[in-house]
């Protein structure tokens, strides 16, 4: 079967998730999905990079999934942001519980009572930990795999504790750097945006978000970084003794990424044939397809096996199945395999293979004695750069700068405007059918716009902001 055109993005996305065996959507509970082995391998490869980045400065931990109602409700502003989405456990077997237990919607209220016990003295700071866990939200909106879920299966949340606001603010900048490195690794362009006051994380001093633009022009939030100031420290009594003997409330940050990063990977790079994966995160990096003719099978298979052996440092599949070559091409294109070799009888005789890359239509011959690990890694680097450039170009085409509010509603993608910090002006632009994502912390290099200008509403000094329909 062929996939729907990616121009019909919603239909394409649901079809590719199932057909390419990322997630099985047939689980009998709305908003819960099953990882196929192939999809889970992508998850492992993507998250191994995230772990590598986090492990440089953080220790990995694991906190329980059950949070007592007494703790969840302590930070009033925080729980207000989640209370209608919490799953509650009210019974242990048939016995009603004295205190209801929440299935974690996020882990601040699970972790911070323990941080109070761990942080006593300035020598305990900074504290930097992370975990990769599942979280639960009773989503009432339209659910879709990897994007809007009732069980987020792969939530990487980091939490840090610092001596003061300034040190925590410096760490926010570091966290932004971690996420930039991660998304650059995946060749996914992004916008780093400071959320409006009315859309920041409940209980935060401010929120910085990473947004990418999906093929239908809507934006997907793919990471957030929050400066919590001392708000949670006051609620959970997280204090430290300074060198002068005085006790002070700590300041905190938290930042998270979910499997939306994989939704972005699939959506940003994929095409009408299926997945297009960067080399590092492809479960199968190289496929070798023998083109067999009667009587010439042995020579072809010998050449294919030698090549597979030569490249065994990579994740290589020699497809010896009985399908015709065309069916094999279709299968491995759907799976996003970055590099394909074909060897037929004439190729084996000449000592060459025909090479093609998943992101390009062209094929070319290469002498088999020139194919080695170095050559493959060179191709992989070039492929990633092409993916990055193509994605940035497509994303830039979906952003339109406007100088009057009347144009906001007409544009199907992201609208860039200059906007002052006045809340009335912020709400005013939202009356035109799009949400205010916030203000660019930095203008991405793929967007050719100045960072400052006159507010589109009131004419005062403003900064570049983005409006969009969101997932």
From Swiss-Prot:
Coiled coil: none annotated. It catalyses: tRNA(Pro) + L-proline + ATP = L-prolyl-tRNA(Pro) + AMP + diphosphate. SMART domains: ProRS-C_1 (SM00946). One of its GO terms (molecular function) is ATP binding. It is found in: Cytoplasm. Its EC number is 6.1.1.15. It is an enzyme of class 6 (ligase). Pfam families: HGTP_anticodon, tRNA-synt_2b. PROSITE patterns: AA_TRNA_LIGASE_II (PS50862). CDD domains: ProRS_anticodon_zinc, ProRS_core_arch_euk. The keyword Cytoplasm applies. One of its GO terms (cellular component) is aminoacyl-tRNA synthetase multienzyme complex. It comes from the Archaea. Keywords: Aminoacyl-tRNA synthetase, ATP-binding, Cytoplasm, Ligase, Nucleotide-binding, Protein biosynthesis. Its main location: cytoplasm. The keyword Cytoplasm applies. One of its GO terms (biological process) is prolyl-tRNA aminoacylation. Catalyzes the attachment of proline to tRNA(Pro) in a two-step reaction: proline is first activated by ATP to form Pro-AMP and then transferred to the acceptor end of tRNA(Pro). Belongs to the class-II aminoacyl-tRNA synthetase family. ProS type 3 subfamily. Consists of three domains: the N-terminal catalytic domain, the anticodon-binding domain and the C-terminal extension. Homodimer. This is Proline--tRNA ligase. The lineage of its organism: Archaea, Methanobacteriati, Methanobacteriota, Archaeoglobi, Archaeoglobales.
């Amino acid at each position: 079967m062929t996939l729907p055109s990616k121009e019909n993005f919603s239909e394409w996305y649901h079809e590719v998730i199932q057909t390419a065996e990322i997630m099985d959507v047939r689980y009998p509970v709305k908003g819960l999905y099953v990882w196929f082995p192939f999809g889970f391998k992508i998850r492992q490869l993507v998250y191994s990079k995230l772990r590598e980045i986090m492990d440089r400065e953080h220790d990995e931990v694991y906190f329980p999934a059950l949070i007592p109602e007494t703790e969840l409700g302590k930070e009033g502003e925080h729980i207000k942001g989640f209370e209608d989405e919490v799953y509650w456990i009210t019974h242990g077997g048939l016995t009603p519980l004295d205190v209801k237990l929440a299935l974690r919607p996020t882990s601040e209220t699970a972790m911070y009572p323990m941080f109070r016990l761990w942080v006593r003295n300035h020598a305990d700071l900074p504290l930097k930990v992370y975990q990769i866990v599942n979280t639960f939200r009773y989503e009432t909106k339209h659910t879709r795999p990897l994007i809007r879920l009732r069980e987020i299966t792969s939530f990487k949340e980091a939490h840090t504790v610092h001596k003061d606001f300034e040190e925590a603010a410096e760490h926010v900048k570091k966290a932004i750097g971690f996420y930039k490195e991660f998304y650059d690794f995946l060749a996914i362009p992004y916008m780093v945006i400071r959320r409006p006051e009315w859309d920041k994380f409940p209980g935060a001093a401010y929120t910085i978000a990473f947004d990418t633009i999906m093929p239908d022009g809507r934006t997907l939030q793919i990471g957030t970084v929050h400066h919590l100031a001392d708000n949670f420290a006051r609620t959970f009594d997280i204090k430290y003794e300074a060198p002068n003997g005085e006790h002070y409330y700590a300041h905190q940050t938290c930042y998270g990424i979910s499997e939306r990063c994989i939704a972005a990977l699939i959506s940003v790079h994929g095409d009408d044939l299926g997945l297009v994966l960067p080399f590092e995160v492809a479960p199968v990096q190289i496929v070798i397809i023998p083109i067999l003719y009667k009587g010439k099978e042995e020579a072809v298979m010998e050449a294919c096996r030698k090549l597979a052996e030569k490249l065994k440092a990579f994740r290589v599949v020699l497809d010896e199945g009985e399908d015709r070559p065309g069916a094999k091409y279709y299968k491995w294109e759907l799976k996003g395999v970055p590099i394909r070799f074909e060897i037929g009888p004439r190729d084996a005789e000449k000592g060459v293979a025909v090479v093609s890359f998943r992101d390009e239509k062209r094929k070319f011959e290469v002498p088999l004695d020139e194919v080695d690990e170095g050559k493959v890694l060179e191709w992989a680097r070039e492929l990633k750069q092409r993916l990055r450039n193509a994605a940035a170009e497509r994303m830039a085409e979906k952003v339109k700068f406007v100088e009057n509010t009347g144009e906001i509603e007409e544009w199907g993608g992201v609208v860039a405007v200059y906007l002052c910090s006045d809340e009335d002006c912020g709400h005013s632009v939202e009356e035109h059918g799009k949400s205010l994502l916030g203000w660019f912390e930095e203008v991405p290099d793929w967007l050719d716009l100045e960072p400052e200008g006159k507010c589109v509403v009131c004419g005062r000094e403003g900064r570049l902001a983005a409006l969009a329909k969101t997932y």
